Regions:
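Non-heme di-metal
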Residues: 1-119
């Protein structure tokens, strides 16, 4: 292991330890979904839906990124951890759209199918 690889590995360990202790959150239990603003604008819902649409490509971003740094443990595991955290953002916004009544689960599945049909 080169000095750079070792340093990246140590940085990853520190990052992961801090993330576990301070930044972990649950889409399902840390957001008060019962207080969601059902009167939010359609423009806000469209912004959330657009973000969800972009995030549906997360597996592609991750696969490409991990393949680039696969030989470097710290970098590869940082990439995997980043993907996990990033996926929660899309989950939260999808949950928001459904809980707010702005979109149904069926509409969100349809959106996913339309996007994946273009790949």
């Amino acid at each position: 292991m080169s000095r750079l690889e070792e340093r990246l590995y140590r940085e990853y360990l520190q990052f992961f330890e801090k993330a576990e202790a301070e930044r972990r959150w649950s889409v399902f239990s840390d957001i008060p979904w019962e207080k969601v603003n059902r009167g939010a604008s359609e423009e806000l819902a469209l912004c959330a839906e657009t973000f969800c649409s972009v995030e549906m490509y997360l597996p592609d971003y991750v696969a490409g990124g991990i393949n680039v740094v696969r030989d470097y443990f710290g970098q590869a595991w940082f990439q995997a951890n980043w993907a996990y955290e990033e996926s929660k953002h899309s989950l939260a916004l999808t949950h928001y759209l459904v809980k707010s009544g702005k979109r149904s689960e069926e509409q969100m599945f349809d959106l996913q199918n339309r996007i994946f049909a273009r790949k």
